[in-house]
């Protein structure tokens, strides 16, 4: 799937991927790495998504993993106090060599709102 990650790397939206069964982080694109202050991929590889993205010690109560299905998106919104931003979240599941992978695209609603005000 390394070619797939190249597609997401330079998106303005934050994108992350994690193993649905183990919660292990697999990928954060450049926007997500900057948002969470990671200089390189080694800083998050193998860590749990809930530890890094929410600073929790166990899976998040609002985790959508159980709602995810291949070829469908689940959309929801959430404020993340770690980065002090509101996001529209688009989650899906892909299966790669039998491994269930969650991909989340986070659209920063605060930036969108600022842009609307600037260009109105």
Where is each model-derived feature located?
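Per-ARNT-Sim (PAS) sensory domains and their PAS-associated C-terminal
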Residues: 70-88, 94-100
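Sensory modules in modular signal-transduction proteins
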Residues: 1-33
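Hydrophobic beta-strand positions
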Residues: 17-18, 78, 93-94, 106
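Cysteine-centered metal-binding/redox modules
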Residues: 23, 87-90, 103-104
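Sensory coupling linkers of modular signal transduction proteins
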Residues: 94-120
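Terminal output helix/cap of sensory domains in signal transduction proteins
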Residues: 48, 52-79
């Amino acid at each position: 799937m390394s070619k797939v990650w190249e597609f997401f790397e330079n998106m303005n939206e934050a994108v992350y991927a994690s193993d649905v069964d183990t919660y292990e982080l697999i990928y954060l694109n450049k926007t997500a790495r900057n948002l969470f202050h990671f200089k390189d991929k080694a800083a998050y590889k193998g860590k749990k998504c809930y530890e890094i993205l929410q600073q929790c010690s166990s899976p998040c109560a609002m985790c959508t993993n159980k709602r995810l299905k291949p070829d469908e998106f689940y959309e929801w919104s959430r404020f993340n106090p770690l980065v002090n931003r509101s996001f529209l979240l688009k989650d899906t599941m892909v299966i790669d060599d039998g491994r269930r992978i969650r991909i989340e695209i986070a659209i920063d609603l605060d930036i969108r709102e600022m842009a609307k005000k600037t260009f109105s």
